Every structure is written in structure tokens, then in C-alpha cells.
Amino acid sequence: MCAILTLGVWAQSYEQSENYGKKIAVFGGSFSEIIASNITKAYWAEKLRARVTTFGIGGAGFSVITGEDRWLPGQIDRCLATGEKFDIYILWASTNDVTRGVELEEQDRMIKVCIEKIRKGAPEAKILFFSSLPVPILENKVLDPAELESMPERFRENYRNQIVNMKKLPEYVAHQEKVCAEENIPFLNLYTTSGINQYNAPDFFSSDNLHLNTAGYNHIKETQARFIAAH
């Protein structure tokens, strides 16, 4: 059965975790690799005495539509090609598949491809999954024709897709959870457990309302560290 974070699940000290002192590889989009994300990864490293290596690339998703030079299967291939073995492989879902309108079934299929690549290339390793984060301001935004018209034409389609498709984000997260349950992968539902909502989102997001700021990463870092420790 899929392992899902429950608050308070990790009551022991970090030193007692079987994941203490391990090597962790992280794959994903900009959530996993922008400068501010170093806050949460440094926290994992501190609490778990872990060495954390980021393979994530901005704009990446599970589907090749997000870019063959960026997508997660390619990140995993590059990681495995280094010959370095990691103890824990974290798949951190972005919102790029959502905004690009990737079919849910395609997201599911490519998550399974990522899992299979890791299981084949590093059979002794653990795989953990972090869901996409909520982006409440964009999820609740209404498409404004006047705002759209005021934009340079080259930006309009992406903007329209972002606003329309982002309302489907909960469906993508539900499918991420379903796949992890099927594959017996521990799943951290950041969408529901991060505590980020439409009221506090301005405190936790940068000006684009899509990427967390330093306060946002400070807000989720302990939830993530406890999840890693417990699984």
C-alpha cells in the first residue's frame, strides 16, 4: 500500500532513521532546483547528515512534451550514466505537465517509466515521491480577456494554458498518488499536507505566484525531512 505522510508520523530522532547518512538524488522541475530550493535540501542534509545531489531542471515534467533535454526520464538517465549510486531517489513532481496539458494517462505512464529506470539501474535504492505543490493564486485565477489582450502575442497562449489547465492540478496529484500506490512508492502529498492555501500563498510564493520563495521552502522543509526520515 502507498505510504502517505501523516503529521507526527516521525516521532523518533533523525539519527535513528535508517535513512540517516545516505546519499540522495533529486529529480524534478524548478520546484526542485531553483536557488531558494537549496533551503529545504540543506535542511534534509543537516537533519539526516545526507548528501543531496540535484538533477532537476527548470521546466521539466514527466512528459517529453516538457522538453527532451529536461524531462525526468532524461534526468534519471544522466544520473545513472555517471555510475554514482545513490541510496534514495526522490521524484519531485512539478506543474509543467499540467500547464502543458499533458494527458493524465501520459503522466502516469511516464512516472512508471521513471520508476522502472531507477529500479533497473539502482535496484537496492529507495524511491520516494513528492507530489506537485499547490499554487492557489493561479489555481483560483480567472482568465481576464483584457489582461490577455494587453500581453505580447507570443506570451498569450502559454498564459491562457497556464490559467485554464492549472485548475486541473488536483487531478494530476490524485493520479500521481494512484501510480505510487500501484508501484508501492512512498508518496508525500504536498498538495494537501503543505498547509499552503489561498490565504497564506502571498507569503510563500514569489511574484510569479508559481514558485516558492525562501519563506515557502522554509515552510515545507521539515515536512519533507520527516517524510524522508520515516521512509
Residue map of PLM features:
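Bacterial N-terminal signal peptides
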Residues: 1-6
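Boundary at the C-terminal end of the N-terminal hydrophobic targeting segment
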Residues: 11-15
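Conserved SGNH/GDSL esterase-like catalytic core that processes O-acyl groups on lipids
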Residues: 17-26, 31-112
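Residue-level recognition of beta-strand->loop/alpha-helix junctions
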Residues: 54-56, 131, 189-192
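Alpha/beta-hydrolase-fold catalytic nucleophile elbow
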Residues: 92, 130-131
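Alpha-helical scaffolding segments of alpha/beta enzyme cores, especially the outer helices
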Residues: 106-109, 113-120, 171-178
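A short helix->loop->beta-strand "cap" motif at the edges of active sites that frequently abuts
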Residues: 121-127
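Catalytic His-Asp segment of secreted/periplasmic serine-dependent ester chemistry enzymes
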Residues: 135-231
